[in-house]
UniProtKB/Swiss-Prot annotation:
Annotated ranges, domain RUN: 52-182
A Pfam family annotated for this UniProt entry: RUN
The protein's name: RUN domain-containing protein 3A
GO process annotations (BP): positive regulation of cGMP-mediated signaling
Coiled-coil stretches: 237-314
Length: 428
């Protein structure tokens, strides 16, 4: 008994699960079909003129697309997050779209709720003619998509790829919206009007679409009229209608073709600009490299010259010093005049003069020079003596020379006066 009850319960659960999945599949198919009808209506009526918020076809299309993006959407994660909408998914999944409008919509002051931001994004994407690009980019982020949608959602099925293909044709239409209207308040629910599509018949210019002739909710009802095939018409009025519809279809395709050609030209111009900029940057980089190499070589040459100068100065440092020191020694001890030709040499002792002891004072500089000469003669002079030394050598008994006697350290001095160029005064 209990076993049969459990089996029946499991069977009922399986049937309810199948019924639930079937209802989700029907809902998914109906939304995609209605979206296809809505896009076709927009392309047929508004190819030559822009669309604004007052268009009923656009209001219905916006409601359909909002239902598609909200199909099987998960609720808020916690109680303080508030009611989430598809904008939370778009904000994360479309952040990688180049030059996107996500940050602009986030910074709008008059739009606060998540639903209002989603509606504003839908209008901005249509005005940018990039709605299909946004949705295609969001679908590539499968991890984020599974995070925001439950199993069976349109965004997780192959119908999402069909949706992006349908939305490409909207690039041929010019949209103009005001982002401060009542439609962006986010308080009212988006309601789809199915009445224009309940008895939608297949037109002559969409013969290849098999699903377009089916109705949405009442496809199996008695009121719906099916038109699987178009009968062959021969009257003139029917041919005119067919020609008129084909002409309208041609205008739509031509407008789409013009839009795609313009898009291709834009991308080609952008590519050329990028290539030119790349060439300029490459040339500038090469020029900078050449300039840096030139400056490097110049700096290396300067370093080599400085090194040569240093190596030439360091070994010959003592030669200019000896030259500079020899000049003041010669000037300080010039040659004495020949004031006595009879005597060749005289030896002066401290006690040989009746006057106070004469001496020859040596300055500290001369003593230092004597030390630097390493034992060489500290006074060199030739035979031709100058009068500047007469006061030092000829007036030994004068008073100024006597006053400088205490500074004399040596006891005797030898003055050689001869014809040979020998030192004039050497200490004995």
């Amino acid at each position: 008994m209990e076993q049969s009850f459990m089996q029946s319960a499991m069977a009922m659960g399986a049937q309810s699960k199948k019924g639930f999945s079937r209802s989700i599949a029907v809902e998914r198919k109906n939304l995609i079909t209605v979206c296809r009808f809505s896009v076709k209506t927009l392309l047929e009526k508004y190819t030559a003129e822009p669309i604004d918020d007052s268009s009923e076809e656009f209001i219905n299309f916006a409601a359909i697309l909002e239902h598609i993006l909200s199909h099987r959407f998960k609720g808020s994660g916690s109680w303080f997050d508030g009611q989430r909408s598809f904008w939370d998914f778009i904000r994360l999944a479309c952040s990688k779209v180049p030059n996107n409008c996500i940050s602009s919509i986030e910074n709008m002051e008059n739009i606060n709720s998540s639903r209002a931001k989603g509606r504003a994004w839908l209008r901005v994407a249509l005005m940018e003619k990039r709605l299909s690009e946004y949705i295609a980019t969001a679908l590539r982020d499968s991890r984020t998509t599974r995070r925001f949608y439950d199993e069976g959602a349109i965004m997780l099925r192959e119908e999402a790829t069909v949706l992006t293909g349908m939305l490409i044709g909207l690039g041929a239409i010019d949209f103009s919206f005001c982002l401060k209207g009542e439609a962006l308040d986010g308080k009212s629910e988006a309601v789809i009007d199915y009445t224009p599509y309940l008895k939608f018949t297949q037109s002559y210019d969409y013969l290849s679409d098999d699903e377009d002739g089916q109705s949405v909710d009442s496809s199996n009802s008695d009121d719906s009229v099916e038109h699987p095939y178009i009968p062959l018409v021969t009257d003139e009025e029917s041919w005119r209608n067919k020609c008129r519809k084909m002409e309208q279809r041609f205008k739509i395709v031509n407008a789409q073709k013009g839009y795609l050609e313009e898009l291709v030209r834009l991308r080609e111009s952008q590519l050329k600009n990028v290539e030119m900029e790349n060439k300029k940057l490459t040339a500038g980089l090469e020029e900078l490299q050449q300039q840096s190499q030139k400056e490097k070589r110049e700096l290396e040459n300067i370093i080599l010259e400085l090194q040569e100068q240093l190596t030439s100065l360091i070994p010959g440092e003592s030669h200019p010093l000896s030259k500079d020191l020899s000049i003041p020694l010669v000037n300080q001890w010039p040659s004495l005049q020949n004031y006595n030709n009879q005597e060749d040499s005289k030896l002066y002792h401290r006690g040989s003069f009746p006057s106070p002891e004469p001496h020859i004072s040596l300055t500290t500089g001369s003593q230092r020079t004597e030390r630097k000469q390493n034992g060489k003669s500290w006074c060199t002079a030739e035979k031709d003596y100058t009068p500047s030394m007469l006061g030092l050598c000829g007036s030994m008994s004068s008073l100024p020379s006597c006053k400088s006697l205490p500074s004399l350290r040596s006891t005797e001095c030898l003055v050689n006066i001869s014809a040979e160029p020998s030192p004039a005064l050497t200490p004995s």
